[in-house]
């Protein structure tokens, strides 16, 4: 029974993790991972996220930081991120609804509320609470003069997914993107199931620890570019390509423009989820002719196995379970 609960938790956390990909393109050298699993103590398992520095190959131009982020973490993690971001000349940040923030690189298309939106609920915020963590949007102060939103709007993504077809009356496309939105805002049946599962985790300290350990193992072990994953239905593969590649292309346009505005001694931080970084690094190195010089690793969150009542045998079993799931997805 206990292992069945672990399996359910594994499926839940794998479904909700914003992480690296499941397969790697064969013709492009793979960047180094932006996540890793560390053991700062004998009984502690920790997820660490990288901030990676890039400088021009010709040594003339501003510094670029690919500041990858985990969307749920400990408060101290986001405090360290805030301190780092506040020190940069410009921060280009992720946010699919740019109109929700006061600073923009450019004016987006008017945002239309997607079908089934429940504005009072966020799956990622609920996930953070269930794990005893905090959600990125609740912990980072975006009201900074150097923070610029650089993302597509919901309507822009819906238009790309529709491929020229008219949108339905409520602004949606009847595509996987709308299904994903309804899961994330809890308005669909599957979203409701996730809500129940998250409450189940929140009510049990040991299951909470197991869920955090599963998330650490899943995010820490996934590598590569998410848009290269094999075996997905065409609609879902297109959705992933839009969510990663189309948004990254939009970001690169803004990044190129901002590089021309700030002095060579300045710096630009690209503040996006870890799943974007593999593709972004390839674009920064090949299109802008930058190369990496250093990494700063920040601990997102940890699990103390001993305090959580997880035995070494159970931890090893969970690690093998997650690794087996990763291997199956990569084979697909």
Residue positions per predicted region:
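Portal/gating segments that form or line small-molecule/metal binding sites
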Residues: 237-261
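A short acidic-Thr-Gly-centered motif at the start of a beta-strand
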Residues: 51-60, 253-264
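Structured, acidic catalytic/metal-binding patches in enzyme active sites
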Residues: 24-246, 292-317, 328
């Amino acid at each position: 029974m206990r292992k069945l609960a672990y399996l359910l938790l594994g499926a839940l956390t794998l479904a909700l993790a914003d992480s690296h990909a499941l397969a790697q393109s064969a013709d492009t050298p793979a960047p180094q991972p932006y996540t890793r699993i560390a053991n700062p103590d004998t009984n502690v398992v920790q997820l660490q996220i990288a901030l990676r520095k890039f400088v021009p190959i010709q040594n003339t131009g501003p510094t670029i930081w690919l500041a990858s982020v985990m969307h749920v973490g400990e408060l101290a993690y986001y405090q360290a991120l805030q301190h780092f971001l506040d020190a940069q000349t410009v921060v280009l940040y992720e946010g699919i609804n740019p109109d929700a923030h006061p600073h923009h690189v450019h004016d987006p298309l008017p945002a239309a509320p997607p079908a089934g939106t429940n504005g009072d609920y966020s799956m990622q915020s609920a996930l953070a609470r269930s794990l005893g963590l905090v959600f990125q949007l609740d912990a980072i102060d975006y009201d900074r003069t150097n923070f610029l939103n650089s993302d597509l709007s919901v309507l822009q993504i819906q238009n790309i997914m529709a491929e020229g077809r008219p949108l339905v009356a409520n602004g949606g496309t009847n595509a996987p993107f709308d299904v994903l939105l309804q899961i994330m805002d809890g308005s669909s049946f599957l979203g409701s199931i996730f809500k129940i599962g998250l409450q189940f985790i929140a009510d049990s300290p040991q299951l909470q620890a197991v869920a955090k350990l599963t998330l650490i193992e899943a995010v820490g072990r996934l590598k590569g570019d998410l848009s290269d994953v094999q075996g997905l239905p065409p609609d879902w593969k297109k959705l992933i390509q839009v969510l990663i590649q189309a948004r990254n292309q939009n970001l690169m346009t803004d990044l190129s423009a901002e590089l021309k505005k700030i002095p060579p001694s300045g710096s630009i931080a690209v503040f996006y989820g870890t799943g974007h970084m593999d593709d972004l690094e390839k674009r920064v190195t090949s299109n802008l002719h930058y190369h990496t010089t250093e990494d700063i690793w920040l601990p997102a969150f940890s699990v103390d196995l001993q305090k959580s009542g997880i035995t070494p045998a159970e931890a090893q079993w969970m690690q093998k379970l997650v690794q087996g799931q990763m291997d199956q997805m990569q084979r697909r």
